[in-house]
Amino acid sequence: MRKKMLGMFLAGVLAMTALTACGETANGNNGAATTGDQNQDQPADGQTSAEPAGDGALTGTLNLGVIGPMTGAAALYGNAVKNGAEIAVEEINAIDPAFQISLDVQDDVHDPEISVNAYQTLKDNKVQVIVGTVTTSPCLAVSAEANSDRVFMLTPSASSPSVTEGKDNIFQLCFSDPNQGSASAQYISDNKLATKVAVIYNNGDAYSTGIYQTFKSKASELGLEVVSETTFTDDTATDFTVQLKAAQDAGADLLFLPIYYQPASLILKQASDMGFSPKMFGVDGMDGILTMEGFDTKLAEGVILLTPFSADAEDEATANFVKKFNDKVGETPSQFAADGYDCPYAIYRALEFYAAKNGGLDVTDMSYADLCEILISVFTDPSFSVDGITGQGMVWDANGEVNKAPKAVVIENGVYVGM
């Protein structure tokens, strides 16, 4: 019953929102994609525009870049995306030897300046399309460069609206921050999870602040009482006693945490130490807490997350991915790994779609600018959709946002369980 209720309400909440996904099939029976204006930029050095293959086939080798934190505090996210993308590329390359993807992964250490340097390295390496960046602040910096250069980017997990705003070549596969905030409030209200809600968020982080703002607005609209709103910054993310005491004194029976898993792990530990045990509700940034080194997963028992991916889903595509990821990494994949897997598939299906509608496509040595215009035309084509492990029938709008329904999962006995 809970699954049915969740599916009905989330479909309504997000039916008109935009987000992304990719996967095994593309549906495009009505209307062909168009290339648009391909003269907005000159080809990269040594690159030329590709000619149609003539038979509807997709051929050649696509140089695909990935940017994310492979080291540093956010490395769990970056490596999850990298490993997911590598599995997808291996599968795609096995489908047809006439079309191959070459993957180039660059570390940005979750730093905007380093991320821009990584982007320049990818351009120097003749990369044509980019999956990334993984986190929001670096993506804001890189997306500005890519928009100016006319390089197509599909970010697996940078969820701020500012990432795509005013940039027609930047697309998201993840939920946008506003959608996460409003959907969370709706779910809490519809399922009567709380009478009094407290919020702890990072007011120095665009991701956390964006989700908080739309959560607060939607909660007010729904009559959901928010009794405590406290903040922290990256520099103060060690002691949450004051924030937890404020929530406890206000009588909160649910704590909404639109934050990443590192500070969330400390909040769970410190709440337990002080005997404060409200329901805990997070969003996609908390995914990964179960694999955090040194974290006692018993502290996360009963935590609810809103996410596009559930590793315990019973469909064949998810089961196959979970097995391959576990064989490769030795752990259950997170939502970030699933996003990383879906991104190369979305790009692959888009190129297939274009080739089928335009007599073929050979991407070898094709300029990133020409590929950018092709991918924009396909991703915004109403007849193009993608089925992936993070969503079925996903479509994009002209703002680069994807439309897909989230899933609620609860942590039970150290694993995610669909609700």
Predicted segments with their positions:
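Positively charged n-region of N-terminal signal peptides that target proteins for export
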Residues: M1-L10
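C-terminal motif of bacterial Sec signal peptides marking the signal peptidase cleavage site
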Residues: T17-A21
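Extracytosolic ligand-binding ectodomains
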Residues: G23-M419
